């Protein structure tokens, strides 16, 4: 695997549950799998209790390179949603999905996911996506 990845929450959950396999462990350890703010916030929202929140946040910051959204992110998410609407599939993508897809496009990353919505986005945009599980 020679590509770099932006991990979505759906894949991040599988990774931390140890469902992803050793290939992904190696890629994460090598710094080839990054994280963006919408995913960090969505993941941490599900963490129970204050100590667990800070422990999980520290771990995310230590393990994953951070990919920031560029200034045009909102205009680009609007354009992506319109592109999906033109294809009749705009209801598939949540605001977080749109942000993840656009941030990945901005940095030329492959979206690492376990969410059929990214497959739908990829069919419309042609952007690279990969499922963390098979």
Which positions does each model-derived feature cover?
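Phosphate- and divalent-cation-binding pockets in alpha/beta enzyme and binding domains
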Residues: 42-43, 76, 120-121
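Acidic, PIN/NYN-like endoribonuclease modules and their adjacent C-terminal/linker elements
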Residues: 2-4, 101, 105-134
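Active-site-proximal, substrate-binding regions of enzyme catalytic domains
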Residues: 51-72
């Amino acid at each position: 695997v020679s590509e770099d990845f932006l991990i979505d929450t759906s894949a991040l959950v599988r990774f931390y549950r140890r469902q992803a396999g050793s290939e992904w462990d190696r890629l994460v350890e090598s710094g080839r799998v990054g994280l963006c703010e919408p995913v960090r916030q969505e993941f941490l929202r599900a963490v129970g209790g204050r100590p667990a929140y800070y422990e999980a946040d520290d771990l995310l910051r230590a393990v994953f390179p951070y990919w920031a959204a560029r200034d045009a992110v909102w205009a680009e998410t609007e354009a992506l949603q319109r592109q999906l609407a033109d294809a009749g599939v705009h209801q598939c993508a949540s605001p977080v999905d749109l942000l993840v897809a656009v941030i990945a496009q901005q940095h030329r990353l492959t979206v690492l996911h376990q969410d059929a919505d990214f497959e739908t986005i990829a069919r419309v945009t042609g952007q690279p996506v990969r499922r963390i599980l098979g």
